[in-house]
Amino acid sequence: MLPSSIQISGEPLSGAEVRDICRGLRDNAVRLLSLRGCRLCDRDFGRICRALAGATSLAQLNLNLGVVSSPSRIKQLAEALRTNRSIQSLFLHGSPLTDAGLALLNPALALHPALVALDLGDCMLGDEAINLICGLLPPDGAKSGLKELTLSANPGITPKGWSRLAIAVAHSSQVRVLNLDYNPLGDHVAGMLAVAVASSRTLEVLDLEGTGLTNQSAQTLLDMVENYPTALRSLVLAENSISPELQQQICDLLSEGEEEEEVAGGAGDTQEWERGREPAAHQRGSSSWMCPSDPSSQMVLMTSGLGDSLLAETEM
């Protein structure tokens, strides 16, 4: 039987449901487990963690919106991740981890052989967490390093922390998707990120929605896109104080680059993205403007679901 998905959102989990989830994990019948915003007791959370520790079919685990709500649950999840070898995408958006909680998780994350996508948006992180995250980016032996990283809405991270991340992305990472939306980055940090993008050979998607940018940083990004060949395909600049003219110029240049790649490599290389990340802009009820690589696209690219896409590539 092919592995299936279990997706429950915002509901209290009964004992029977928890038993079914654990049985599916132990039988390796679950490829995607999403318990986004679900409510369950500590005992049942521990049962699920013990079951997912040995699951070999589980590729994506979504515990967004407060499921991992205490230090004891963080420790239980860390213990499960130390044993698990199959999870490629881990979503913890909206979990009150703090730097201390990520320090508990980090050893398991650093040693996990399959993890390529990590969502730590709105997790109350600061600069100490950034130091740990930077260590997850580069390849290490058989590990490929992270390919998708979400750090949306972590205002406790200072410019010093963001500069460290920019250096890590530029130097040795394999990151394709970097979501930094709804952080107070400002023009100075955006300038450092432009240098990182220009240096990176892999970064395809950069989300800077609602990050306090102005025309100053937009001009820097425009110069980068215009004068330096990069892998960048999508740059999200909604909810910033940037003129429509500058936004359109950046968008046009990215679209031109994408068209040239399609002519050279064929349209069959286009990545098919999934949405596993919390749609921060939609939660805030904001209007959205994006700079997509595909001029026919009508919506903001909120996430890539890259771990699942990579699994599909491997199976082909």
Curated annotation (Swiss-Prot):
Gene3D superfamilies: Ribonuclease Inhibitor (3.80.10.10)
Database matches in SUPFAM superfamilies: RNI-like
Composition bias type Low complexity, residue spans: 286-296
Name of encoding gene: LRRC73
Residue spans of biased composition, Basic and acidic residues class: 272-281
InterPro entries in the record: LRR-containing_regulator, LRR_dom_sf
Coiled coil: none
Residue numbers spanned by region Disordered: 257-296
Organism per entry: Homo sapiens
UniProt entry tagged with the keyword Repeat: yes
UniProtKB keywords: Leucine-rich repeat, Repeat
Protein name listed in UniProt: Leucine-rich repeat-containing protein 73
Ranges: LRR repeats: 57-78, 86-106, 114-137, 145-166, 174-187, 202-223, 231-250
